[in-house]
From Swiss-Prot:
It catalyses: D-fructose 6-phosphate + L-glutamine = D-glucosamine 6-phosphate + L-glutamate. The gene is glmS. Catalyzes the first step in hexosamine metabolism, converting fructose-6P into glucosamine-6P using glutamine as a nitrogen source. It is found in: Cytoplasm. GO terms for molecular function: carbohydrate derivative binding; glutamine-fructose-6-phosphate transaminase (isomerizing) activity. Residues 2-219 form the Glutamine amidotransferase type-2 domain. Keywords: Aminotransferase, Cytoplasm, Glutamine amidotransferase, Repeat, Transferase. This is Glutamine--fructose-6-phosphate aminotransferase [isomerizing]. Pfam families: GATase_6 (PF13522), SIS (PF01380). PROSITE patterns: GATASE_TYPE_2, SIS. It is an enzyme of class 2 (transferase).
Length: 610
C-alpha cells in the first residue's frame, strides 16, 4: 500500500524518483506525485490522479531540476482519490510524503486550525506537514531534531520522509509500523518503502527498525533509535535481481509468476536436503532443542498466507502429531488468547511487513509463547528481524497483487518444517522419505500440469457472465478451495465462496442452480468417494460443475460436469499441486472479463496499515 521514494544526490533526481514509483506500482495506488528541490531552494511539485505514467508525461512538460526530491504513490484512506489529496503535501517550506494512518489526525487538525493553519486536503498527512512547520517555527532546531519532537504527538502507523527546501542537502525519514529502507550510494543516498524501487541506483541497503528516525545527506546517514540515541543499522548487499520487475514475454506479472513456480520451488528446496532428510540448519544451533519442546503450534497470517497456514494445520496434526491452530492476524491481536503450554508461534507473510501480522507477533512476546518463527519471502523484513527464527521462501520478487508463487513456496517450506518437527517427535522415517520424494518431484509435476493451460483457458468462458461461484474441497484440499475462491474474487470481481464439501447440506446447497458454477478439487485419496457424493448432490440440482480430478479418480464428463484430468500426484504434495490449475482458471476468467489482473481495484500488494 502506498509507495515512497526519496533521493539526495549531486545529479537531477526526477527520473530516479519516477522510475522508483514505476517499480512500486504493484503495491496498489490511485494517485502519484513528486517534489524536487534545486540548490537555490526552489520546489517543483507535480501531482496527478491515476497511473504513474500520467505523472511521468506531466513531468516531461515541466522543468524538474534538482538533486533532492521525494515521490509517492497514494492508496486513499483519508480523503477520496484526487490531485488535492495526492502527496507530497506542503506547509510553506516543509514538504512531506507519508505511508500509514495517523489515528489522532482529527484533534491534531483542529489544533492546527486553531493555530491559524489552512488545510487544502482531507488527508492526515497534511496535518503532519503543518505540525513540523509549526514546531520548527516555534522552537527551531535542525530538521531531524524537529521531526523527533513531532513524533510523540502522533498516534498510529507511519513511514514518512520530510524535506525543508531551505536546506536541500538533507532528508529526514521516520518509521513506525510502515517499512522504509535506505539505499547507499557514492556521493548520493536514497530511501524507499521497498528496495525494489532503488535497484537501478544501488544494491546496498539499510533497513530502518521500528521507531527509527534517519537523517540522510549525500555523504552520510545517521540513524536514531526510538530512545533518540544514535544507532547502527546493518548494511546488506541485495541479492534481488535488477530485472525482477520485468514481465518479459508474459502479458501480466501474475501469468509470469504462475509459470515461475517450478523454479521458485526448486530455489526454495535448494540446500535443504541432506542424506535423504530435511535440513533446516539455517534455523540456528539451538533450534532443535526448542522445536523438540513444541507441544502446540499457533499460526498467524492474513489473506493467502492464512490459507497456506490452514493447509499446514492438516500436516502438523496428521504427520507430526502436533495440535495446530490457525488464526487471522487481525482477529488474534484484538482478543485475549489462552496460550497453550510450549506453544510455537508461526507467522506467515510474503512481504514480512503485514501490519496485523507484525502486531500479532509483537503481542505474542508478551503472552508467553515458547518462541516465534517467521516464514517470509523478504530477507531483512520486520517480521524476519523480530522473530526468534526464520525460514525464507525463495520465490523471488512477486509483483502481482494476487499471490501465486509466494503461496506455493510457503506451503513448500511449511511441509519441510512439519517433517523436521515430526522427526524430533519420533515421526516414522518413511513419512519424511515420502515428503522428501514428493517435494523433489513437485517442480516437474507442476511443469507437466502447466501444459494444460489451454484446456483450462477454454473453461474460463463459462464464468464470464456469472456473478457468483462456489469452490468445494475436502480435507487438506478445503483450504485450496478457499485459495481458489480468493483468487477468483480478487482478480475477476466474481463473488466466490469456498466450503468444505461436507457442509453443502448445511446451507450452500440452497444456492445451487444453472447460474452457479461449482469448482471442485478432487485428488484420488481416502475422501474421494465422500466427495463424489457431494458432487452428485450438485448435479441433481442443475449446478454446473468444473472438477479438477486425478486422472485415476474415475470421473467422466457429462452435460453439466466438465472434468479436467490432472496427473496422479503423491498425496502429501497434492494441496500444492492442485493450487496451480485454480490460479490459471482465475487468471483466464479475469482476462475475459477485462479486469486489471496485476492491480485489482481497491487492493494493494503489501498491506502495511491496519
Amino acid at each position: 500500500m502506498c509507495g515512497i521514494v526519496g533521493a539526495v544526490a549531486q545529479r537531477d533526481v526526477a527520473e530516479i524518483l519516477l522510475e522508483g514509483l514505476r517499480r512500486l506500482e504493484y503495491r496498489g495506488y490511485d494517485s502519484a506525485g513528486l517534489a524536487v528541490v534545486d540548490s537555490e531552494g526552489h520546489v517543483a511539485r507535480l501531482r496527478r490522479l491515476g497511473k504513474v505514467q500520467v505523472l511521468s508525461q506531466a513531468a516531461e512538460e515541466h522543468e524538474l531540476h534538482g538533486g533532492t526530491g521525494i515521490a509517492h504513490t497514494r492508496w486513499a484512506t483519508h480523503g477520496e482519490p484526487s490531485e488535492e489529496n495526492a502527496h507530497p503535501h506542503i506547509s510553506e517550506h516543509i514538504t512531506i510524503v507519508h505511508n500509514g494512518i495517523i489515528e489522532n489526525h482529527e484533534p491534531l487538525r483542529e489544533l492546527m486550525i486553531g493555530r491559524g493553519y489552512r488545510f487544502v486536503s482531507e488527508t492526515d498527512t497534511e496535518v503532519v506537514a503543518h505540525l513540523v512547520h509549526f514546531e520548527q517555527k516555534q522552537n527551531g532546531g535542525t530538521l531531524v531534531e524537529v521531526v523527533k519532537r513531532v513524533i510523540p504527538q502522533l498516534r498510529g502507523a507511519y513511514g514518512m520522509v520530510v524535506l525543508d527546501n531551505r536546506d536541500s542537502s538533507v532528508l529526514v525519514a521516520a518509521r513506525s509500523g510502515s517499512p522504509l529502507v535506505i539505499g547507499r550510494g557514492v556521493g548520493e543516498n536514497f530511501i524507499a518503502s521497498d528496495q525494489l524501487a532503488l535497484l537501478p541506483v544501488t544494491r546496498r541497503f539499510m533497513f530502518l527498525e521500528e521507531g527509527d528516525v534517519a537523517e540522510i545527506t549525500r555523504r552520510d546517514v545517521r540513524v536514531f533509535d526510538k530512545s533518540g540515541q544514535l544507532a547502527t543499522r546493518e548494511e546488506i548487499e541485495s541479492k534481488v535481481s535488477y530485472d525482477a520487475g520485468d514481465k518479459g514475454a508474459y502479458r501480466h506479472y501474475m501469468q509470469k509468476e504462475i509459470y515461475e513456480q517450478p523454479m521458485a520451488i526448486k530455489n526454495t528446496l535448494e540446500g535443504r536436503f541432506s542424506h535423504g532428510e530435511i535440513n533446516l540448519s539455517e534455523l540456528g544451533p539451538k533450534a532443535d532443542e526448542l522445536l523438540a519442546k513444541v507441544e502446540h503450534v499457533q499460526i498467524i497470517a492474513c489473506g493467502t498466507s492464512y490459507n497456506s497456514g490452514m493447509v499446514s494445520r492438516y500436516w502438523f496434526e496428521a504427520l507430526a502429531g502436533i495440535p495446530c491452530d490457525v488464526e487471522i492476524a487481525s482477529e488474534f491481536r484484538y482478543r485475549k488468547p489462552a496460550v497453550r503450554k510450549n506453544s510455537l508461534m508461526i507467522t506467515l507473510s510474503q512481504s514480512g511487513e503485514t501490519a496485523d501480522t507484525l502486531a500479532a507477533l509483537r503481542l505474542s512476546k508478551e503472552l508467553g509463547y515458547l518462541g516465534s518463527l517467521a516464514i517470509c519471502n523478504v530477507a531483512g523484513s520486520s517480521l524476519v528481524r523480530e522473530s526468534d527464527m526464520a525460514l525464507m521462501t525463495k520465490a523471488g520478487v512477486e509483483i502481482g497483487v494476487a499471490s501465486t508463487k509466494a503461496f506455493t513456496t510457503q506451503l513448500t517450506v511449511l511441509l519441510m518444517l512439519v517433517a523436521r518437527v515430526g522427526r524430533l517427535r519420533g515421526m516414522d522415517a518413511q513419512i519424511e522419505h515420502d515428503i522428501v520424494h514428493g517435494l523433489q518431484a513437485l517442480p516437474a509435476r507442476i511443469e507437466q500440469m502447466l501444459s494444460q493451460d489451454k484446456l483450462i483457458e477454454s473453461l474460463a468462458e463459462g464464468f464470464s457472465d456469472k456473478h457468483h461461484a462456489l469452490f468445494l474441497g475436502r480435507g487438506d484440499q478445503y483450504p485450496i478451495a478457499m485459495e481458489g475462491a480468493l483468487k477468483l474474487k480478487e482478480i475477476s470481481y466474481i463473488h466466490a465462496e469456498a466450503y468444505a464439501a461436507g457442509e453443502l447440506k448445511h446451507g450452500p446447497l440452497a444456492l445451487i442452480d444453472a447460474d452457479m458454477p461449482v469448482v471442485v478439487v478432487a485428488p484420488n485419496n481416502e475422501l474421494l468417494e465422500k466427495l463424489k457424493s457431494n458432487i452428485e448432490e450438485v448435479r441433481a440440482r442443475g449446478g454446473e460443475l468444473y472438477v479438477f480430478a486425478d486422472e485415476d479418480a474415475g470421473f467422466t464428463s457429462s452435460e453439466n460436469m466438465k472434468i479436467i484430468p490432472l496427473p496422479h500426484i503423491e498425496e502429501v504434495i497434492a494441496p500444492i499441486f492442485y493450487t496451480v490449475p485454480l490460479q490459471l482458471l482465475s487468471y483466464h476468467v479475469a482476462l475475459i472479463k477485462g479486469t486489471d489482473v496485476d492491480q485489482p481495484r481497491n487492493l494493494a500488494k503489501s498491506v502495511t496499515v491496519e
